[in-house]
Amino acid sequence: RMAATSPHNDRLYRETALQSIVARLLRKHGAVSPSPPDAGALSQGRLRRVTRHVRGHLDANLSLDDLADVVGLSKYHFSRRFKERTGQSPYQFVIYERVRAARHLLQETTRPLAQIAFDVGFSSQSHFTRTFKRHVGATPGRYRAAWRA
């Protein structure tokens, strides 16, 4: 009876209970490992995640904070690392992807230009037209007409 209440058994009980709690937390939330030295790098996998996110959400207002959150980096580190990896800023990449998607829609659909502008995330048809012309060298209407000719 004395052995059950000794300080040694009490300490052993607390340690066992604590280990049990930690084990349950790790099973539920996953093991946490220390960050590797290149934790701030924009790996190929992280770059793919950002690319998929941008392409899947072109119609959304894609902020630098949103893109950085996709890969778990601060917006400062994300922006810097993204430009190092791709040669363009995240904003330039989003615009490039919007124009690329618009070209596809102009080629493959008969949707009105205003609808295409909205579908790929431009705030207005005039903004879409200016940006498209700057990147492609023709307005969306002329691009579509030339493609169909």
Cite the ranges covered by each PLM segment.
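Short, Lys/Arg-enriched, Trp-marked, Pro/Gly-tolerant hinge/linker segments that flank
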Residues: 3-71, 84-92, 96
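Short, charged alpha-helical segments
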Residues: 13-16, 127, 131
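Short, leucine/isoleucine-rich alpha-helical interaction segments at C-terminal helix-coil junctions
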Residues: 21-28, 135, 143-147
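Terminal helix-turn-helix DNA-binding modules in bacterial transcription factors
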Residues: 52-66, 73, 84-125, 129, ...
